[in-house]
C-alpha cells in the first residue's frame, strides 16, 4: 500500500501532472522526453537561477544541446503568479463561480490522474490529456488582469479608462514572454512531413484501392490530403 501511494504521489501526480502544469505556467527545460528520470531532460524550469538549482543543480556551463534546446522556455513564474492572483481574486469576489472553475480544474486534472491510473514508461508525453485543467487555470490568469486593475484603482483612487489600460499594459508581459519563448519551437512553417507521408500513401495505390494503415497517427494525414487538399479522393 505504501509503495502504491508513493507511486501515485511521486509519479502519477507529481511527474505526470504537476510537471506538465509547470511546463505551461512556469517554464520547460527541453522538448526531449526523458528516460529513467534523467535530470537533464523534460523537467520544469523557471529561469530563476537559485530556484532551478535547488531542483536541477547548477545551470551554468551546460552542453550546447541542452542550453540552446528550442524547447527550453522560461517564464519566471509570471503566468503562474498572475493565475494565482486571479484565483484569490475570484475566491474573494465570487465564491460560487470560483467553485465552478475549481471543480473544472480538479476534474480535468487531478481527477483524470486517478481515472487514467497512468502506467510507468509511457510511449510519449501525456500533457495534452490535462488541457482542460490548464484552460481552467487560464481563466484565473484572465481574472488576474481584473485584480491588477482593481489594485491600480485602489492605489490611485481613480476610476475610468486609465486603470484598465494600465492593467492591460502591465499584464501583457505574460502573453509576451510566452510568445517570445515558445515561437521558435512551436512554429510549424515548412514542417511538411505528416502531409508528405499522407501524399505518398495515396499516390502509391491503384485507383479505388483500400488503404490499410497503422492507427490514428497515420490516418490523420490521409484525411487531410483527401478532404482538404483533394488528393486521390477515390
Q: Which positions does each model-derived feature cover?
A:
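Signature aromatic-anchored transmembrane alpha helix within multi-pass, membrane-resident enzymes
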Residues: 95, 143-179
